[in-house]
Each structure stands twice: as structure tokens, then as C-alpha cells.
Swiss-Prot record:
Keywords: Ribonucleoprotein, Ribosomal protein, RNA-binding, rRNA-binding. GO terms for biological process: translation. GO terms for cellular component: ribonucleoprotein complex; ribosome. The keyword Ribonucleoprotein applies. Belongs to the bacterial ribosomal protein bL9 family. The gene is rplI. This is Large ribosomal subunit protein bL9. PROSITE patterns: RIBOSOMAL_L9. Coiled coil: none annotated.
Amino acid sequence: MNVILLDKIANLGNLGDQVSVKAGYARNFLLPQGKAVVANAANTEVFEARRADLEAKLAADLAAATQRAEKISALESVVIASKAGDEGKLFGSIGNRDIADAVTAAGVELAKSEVRLPLGAIRTTGEFEVEVQVHTEVKAIVKLSVVAEA
């Protein structure tokens, strides 16, 4: 199924690209979320008329994401207290939701889906640098300090 993208989509294309995707992906994800329209003559004309508006919206989203990333990077070390054993091994783990909640409590809104932990959950005390993907093109680093509860 050929579609015209209305947004930048990772591993697929940019705004205005006409790409061929599987019908299920288009029907169940791209079309309902407003990220694409079916590629036909009428939709192509409508898209070309709206192209400037869509590009301006993308630029505004990118600028807002860049500002959020700067706020996140400007944060001092975010501290999370958790129960731990004598050797610094946590009883449980620190995951995406815990990190997102701690950063939000520190004053910058952050969703758990934006936190990237490629090595899995944090299971020890110490200092960590966690990558946060605010936008497809914008990433930030959060300094995280995991300490044992008294």
C-alpha cells in the first residue's frame, strides 16, 4: 500500500515521502494516528496545499523538543533512593518509569517512553548517565544518582 507521510517516522521516511508499506501497518498505525494518508491523486493535491503548514508544525515540534532537552541536560544529578544490600545491590531495580517520575519531580516533564536503557534496568547503586530521546532527532543525557535508603 502506498502512503504519503505527514510526519517523520524512524526507519521509514520524512514528511512528504511517498513510501510503500504493508497494508496492516498503514491501516492499524499510520492512518489512525494521522501520520500518513493513502497516496492517490486527490490526497496528493491536498497534501501539497498543506505542505507548508505541516513543515512549520514539524519545525515548531523540533524547537520545543530542543528546549526540553536543554532543560533536561541542565538538571543537576537526579537522585533516586532505593533499598539496597551491603554491597550496593538493589532489592528490585530502577526502570524507565522510576527515572521518568524522578525527572518529572525535579521539574521537567518526561514520559517513560522517552527514557532509553539499552542495558536494561539499573540494579546497583552509583552514578549513571541515562539517555533520553525527546524527539526522533533530539537526545539528552540525564545524570542519575542511585543511593541506598537509610
